[in-house]
Amino acid sequence: NRDKELADPQGFGLIEYAFSRMAADAGIDMSECRLHQEGGRSHFMTRRFDRTSTGDKLHMQSLAAIRHFDFNAAGAYAYEQAIETIRRLGLPAVDIEQQFRRAIFNILIRNQDDHVKNIAFLMDRTGAWRLSPAYDVAYAYNPSGPWTRQHQMSLNGKRDDFDLEDLVAFGGYCGFSRRRALALVAETSAPVSAWRAYADDAGVYE
């Protein structure tokens, strides 16, 4: 995974913060986050979503756990299987739309550490499942590395070199019309095109 393959550069907390804010503006459900400054370093802090407001634990299962998928098997699983799981759990349509946005966002920002442990589900006290907020959402790409040179999960049968028709086809699998899929892609991509503004606001400089 990214921890094995990519170094944790100084200032990565700032990068995570910028991407978290960008993802939220792209319509992705993100936990509240902030930066903690300490000793000249910036630490990315995010509120735990597997706890209630009173601190009680919520049951959480990753896609890997709930489907018995091996997250080390790069390319063995697909975003379509995440959608299939959402349907099998009987989750609402908004969760399908959420997962669509997250897949598109990962492709647009080259978050290629998008393995099956980075999608999760929460069960509340009544036993009802929901898609958890997104996490580990940041640029992760190493063209010479065995792990993140391609996406960990495929989409429309591909792990790289996606085009708009691939995203529309995935939207069709999610149950969206072509028009709706294109609208969601546009909404998700708009903040990505403003990366420099998010980076500057977070203090990320070239």
Describe the residue ranges of each PLM region.
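Conserved kinase catalytic-core segment
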Residues: Q10-A26, A78-N142
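Conserved ATP-binding subdomain of kinase catalytic cores across diverse folds
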Residues: N1-A74
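Catalytic-core segments of enzymes that bind and process phosphorylated/nucleotide-bearing substrates
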Residues: S62, I66-T85, D124-R179
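Regulatory N- and C-terminal appendages and interdomain linkers associated
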Residues: W129-L131, P143, Y173, A190, ...
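Generic, well-ordered alpha-helical scaffold segments in large soluble proteins
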Residues: M22-D29, F49, I66-F69, T85, ...
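Small/polar glycine-rich anion-binding or flexible loop at a beta-alpha turn
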Residues: G39, L182-S193
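Short, surface-exposed acidic
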Residues: F176-V185, E206
